[in-house]
Design a protein with these regions (language model features):
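Hydrophobic alpha-helical segments at protein termini of multi-pass membrane proteins
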Residues: 4-7, 30
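Cofactor-binding active-site loop characterized by glycine-rich and histidine/acidic residues
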Residues: 18-154, 172-178, 182-190
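N-terminal glycine-rich anion-binding loops that anchor highly charged ligand groups
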Residues: 8-22
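A short, conserved beta-to-alpha structural element at the edge of catalytic cores
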Residues: 154-174
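Structural signal for short hydrophobic segments within the conserved structured cores
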Residues: 192-196
Length: 197
C-alpha cells in the first residue's frame, strides 16, 4: 500500500475531529489526535470479511473502517440519520455492514464481545478475523485476560491491539500496571505478541 493511501484517511480523521470540536454542540468526545495512524494501520491490514471493534475512542476506527463521515457526525450529534439512529453516540457507534462491529464506552467492554464475534465466525465457518482495539487502561481488567484465554484455548481468529497512550483515564500507566511491556501480557496464553511504536 502506498504512503498516500495511508495518509489520506489519517488526514480525514484529524480534519473530522477538528471540525467536530469547533461545533458548539459537540458534547463529550474522546479524540484520536496523534493516534490516527493506529486505526488506519489496522484497517489497512483488514479485508472485507474482517470485523473491527474499538474502545470508546471510536471516531478514528469508524472512519478508517469506512463508515461515512456524514453518518459518523450524525451519530455523534444524536441525529436519526446516524448508523445507530443517533442512540449510540461516540461510545456505542457501530456499522456492521462495513465491518465496524462497534465501540464500547466501558473500559475493556469490547474485549469479550470481540471474543464472541470471533467465536460466531468460527462456528459459522465464516472467513475473516476480528481485530479488537482497546486502551492500556483495559489491561488491568479481568475481561482482557478472560478474552485472551478463550481466544487462545479455542484458537479464535482474534487479534488484540492495545492502543497504549500511557493513561487509564487519569491514572498514569506506571501507577496501574506492573508489566514494563504490555505485550508481555500475552505470554501466559502462549499468544504471539509484539510491541510496535
Amino acid at each position: 500500500m502506498d504512503a498516500l493511501a495511508l495518509l489520506r484517511p489519517m488526514m480525514l480523521i484529524r480534519a473530522f475531529e477538528e471540525a467536530l470540536m469547533r461545533r458548539p454542540d459537540h458534547g463529550f468526545q474522546l479524540l484520536s489526535s496523534g493516534e490516527e495512524a493506529i486505526a488506519v494501520g489496522i484497517c489497512a491490514a483488514l479485508g472485507p470479511d474482517d470485523a473491527l471493534l474499538s474502545s470508546g475512542r471510536s471516531i478514528g476506527p469508524a472512519l478508517a473502517r469506512g463508515v461515512e463521515p456524514a453518518a459518523v457526525m450524525a451519530e455523534l450529534l444524536g441525529r436519526t440519520t446516524g448508523p445507530c439512529g443517533g442512540k449510540g453516540g461516540r461510545g456505542h457507534l457501530a456499522q456492521p455492514a462495513v465491518g465496524f462491529f462497534g465501540a464500547h464506552a466501558v473500559v475493556g467492554g469490547n474485549l469479550t464481545i470481540a471474543a464472541g464475534v470471533a467465536l460466531a465466525m468460527t462456528i459459522e465457518q465464516r472467513p475473516g478475523i476480528v481485530a479488537c482495539v482497546f486502551g492500556d487502561g483495559a489491561c488491568g481488567a479481568g475481561a482482557l485476560h478472560e478474552a485472551m484465554n478463550v481466544a487462545a484455548l479455542w484458537k479464535l481468529p482474534l487479534v488484540f491491539v492495545c492502543d497504549n497512550n500511557g493513561w487509564s483515564v487519569s491514572t498514569p500507566r506506571a501507577a496501574a500496571l506492573a508489566p514494563a511491556r504490555l505485550s508481555d501480557l500475552a505470554a501466559p496464553f502462549r499468544m504471539p505478541a509484539a510491541t510496535v511504536d
